[in-house]
């Protein structure tokens, strides 16, 4: 009951997207910050770069910001006032480096006064204005074949959308077609060539309809594509990745499924034999995980990505820990709280430790005043006058952790449970005497704290300051491994990279290989990889080492011809190394209809939102002549009820939607599936057992892994 109350109250904290000046439609996706541990960030996104996730949480473009301009030509070619602006609307939350005057924007929009031959055709163009950090995309069209006057619909957005603008351009072009038809209908109905200058006074609802299309459809579409972080799929031949994947599969089967429930084998068999290939062929196909447990959903997504593609085939970039080497007393460490970059210096201390057997008591030994903790706005005495438990078996440092956590607010670093794991009392007595404590500053928004941290925590063990997860995150199907709340010991990913040859035993070598994945730090943005190596190789092929070619001598029929062998082996580049990542993401608080793989909060309306987005896909497909999609499918996975079902919607000849639901797993039993699928489930189960038992031979491990994740159609 408590978990449900917490989960319900947390939903009210999210502010609707673009609520400052628009009424939000169904297409809106809200991208809100959420808690995720550093190891999951590395597994899902290939990096734990703090700047990437801070941008996701705080610096979102989109907040619905845009500037819409509708303008037209008046037919006065020689006049300076040849262009008239019908609408110039800027949303309140549209912030750019410089406000571009309308005169300059009109030059960008209409450009040269030279006309095209075909006046009936509309044209689109994209302009990047680097000085203002904006992107301007424009639709220019004519009233009819006889008219020579151009009408333009232009939109300014921040340049953050540039990587995905061409990706989602088919959808944007469809919406621009709607806007164009709306204005053309107004001109035809009123038998005029010009839009009204004061459209509000003339009650021109068509202009308002165009503005509403941008507010409710085009801008949320760009936001859904560009604001959501996309998953990084590790290479299929990476031994650390395979070992980590096997570890997660083993934990799921042993701790969550148990000996009777075969939830994971059935789900993986469905992907392997049926849905993975469908997801690759049809962009309208989705996998949606409905859950109230973010951590379990993210672990399941990591498991499912092995069956999806394309996987990265380049070089994995490893993080460099320059501060990992220990040094004698006097070494420097960076501030873990991130409040200041000024390093504190370690010096030996003569502070003593009191241990009693009388439970809670007032310490009678005078402490070093250096380790007292007081509030900035208080004149009270230090921490040596506080009551402390003898079970903590440490000096003032443990009480400092307790005091700091009790006084900290949302902006503070971590929670009390997290600080207990960091405090010297949670470690062995031997380690507490080896290195003296060190003072650190906390970046709390309400108070100033000094935390006593053991010196053996180096600067490379810094984690992203994040709020602690709520109880609701561990309520549903509890994960029995130590939670990130209760542990903060040095993880494998935070160690100094050590050569494999330095390990003496096979067990140490396997442990090192498995932990290598946590050292990955790929250069990336929210939706793209920064693959400089592939770019340099392509440049070298074209410029530094150009391909060989033959020249055909000119004659009376043709000029000189350069013949390039396009079938050259060097030109057969691997298309898997694409910068733009696929639309797969992890847990998001709200459903994003534009992504193919995601997990979202389960509510009473979750399934209805998914079905409604599927119907919209078919509607958009009818408007786009290039698309021939007549059906769309979604694999719905409910972790709360452990149900798996495939929802398919088709459109018949009468344009009616027909929905079919195929239950794969319900109430712990396999649904009415084909014999081939039943055989596939048994085969997948056997492959998983062999994979879990194979730990010594890396070649056999890679072979078994590739066998199980290779998609095979039934």
From Swiss-Prot:
Does the keyword section mention Protein transport? yes
**What protein family does this chain belong to?**
Belongs to the LST4 family.
Q: Which InterPro entries match?
A: DENN_FNIP1/2, LST4_longin
Q: What is this protein called?
A: Protein LST4
| Residues of the dDENN FNIP1/2-type domain | 634-712
Annotated uDENN FNIP1/2-type domain residues: 61-236
Question: What's a GO biological-process term for it?
Answer: amino acid transport
Q: Report the protein's function.
A: Involved in extracellular amino acid uptake. Required for the protein trafficking from the Golgi to the plasma membrane.
Q: What is one cellular component GO term in this UniProt entry?
A: cytoplasm
Keyword annotations from UniProtKB, A to Z: Amino-acid transport, Protein transport, Transport
Protein's UniProt keywords contain Protein transport: yes
Supply the source organism for this entry: Kluyveromyces lactis (strain ATCC 8585 / CBS 2359 / DSM 70799 / NBRC 1267 / NRRL Y-1140 / WM37)
A Pfam family the protein falls into: Longin_2
Which residues does the annotated region (Disordered) include? Answer: 423-447
Tell me the ranges covered by the cDENN FNIP1/2-type domain, including all copies. 244-620
